[in-house]
Amino acid sequence: MYKVFLKRFFFLFLVISQIRGELIIIHCGILIDGESDKPQKVMSILIQEDKIIDVTEGYVNAGENDNLIDLNNFTVLPGLMDMHVHLSGESNPKKYMERFTLNLDDFAYQSTMFAERTLLAGFTTVRDLGGPINNSLRNAINSGKVVGPRIFSAGKSIATTGGHADPTNGMKYELMGDPGPSKGVVNGIADSRKAVRQRYKNGADLIKITATGGVLSVAKNGENPQFIEDEILEIVKTANDYGMHVAAHAHGAEGMKRAIRSGVKSIEHGTLMDKEAMGLMKKMGTYYVPTISAGEFVAEKAEIEGYYPEVVRPKAKKIGPKIKETFKRAYESGVK
């Protein structure tokens, strides 16, 4: 009786919605919904006010004012999510010179191309974890000016002096200067707090820190810890005060464990994660974002003479291939 009532109620709801012209109806030849054990054939998805309100068997008839999307010859599945992207640029042999040859306007224009490519590849939601224009790109997409996925933006990453995301790494001394918290370079608790507040002011959705060295930075160490624990604690505390979580880039185990103990929400890359780190992640509820394809990519490109600066190549060859193996161990141990 309850099921009959629901069906009648839903039929009435459909009639009302059709009269108001509020429905988008998608006819799916094959539907992979992410929950069923196998693909389902001849299905309809009903959408109202940007929300899926029902998925039902058969092809629901569209009302006069409804928007029907006929995909009866296609396979339909939910949009994919990528939790670690950088839409302002791409890896190429000219990347390191682009810091000196491209303006922010140039990065902004090319980011629209990368955003559209990402959406057309099936990714409808992404976390952009560090870039010069990602807040503005998100706003442009949300306002309908640019085609792209829904973006949760970290704004500019937060690093320490000489750390992985210090924008002056590899420059001559006269150009290095002292970038400071607004540019994402911190030293000490006060700087750490200020950098988070600056990103909140700039419209970030979350905070990204580089807890260890990195592969692509122009620095010889790709795994050393780069924050003291008190700095990370302050970043996490301040971010939480402003309703944001913290994602931590980390390759080496020690810097990773400092970040996990401090309460970051996710570990990015996690290449040299050890058993202790895995145990801490399970205890703290920390998520793991392995970036497997990035590891494979940098290892492959490191074999090409001149693709990366010489200081980067050995790091890419060492760290890149290990991510896939680490992911397997982390998954088997129960890390989320």
What are these regions (language model features)?
Residues 5-17:
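Sec-dependent N-terminal signal peptides
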Residues 24-25, 31, 35-77:
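Histidine-rich, glycine-flanked metal-binding segment
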Residues 29, 45, 50, 73, ...:
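Divalent metal-coordination and catalytic microenvironments
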Residues 74-143, 161-168, 230, 254, ...:
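Metal-associated gating/positioning segment near the N- to mid-region
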Residues 110-137, 148-157, 204-217, 245, ...:
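Divalent metal-dependent hydrolysis catalytic cores, especially in the metallo-beta-lactamase
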Residues 135, 142-258, 273:
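Histidine/acidic-residue-rich, glycine-tolerant segments that coordinate divalent metal ions
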Residues 161, 210-325, 332-336:
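Active-site core of metal-dependent hydrolases
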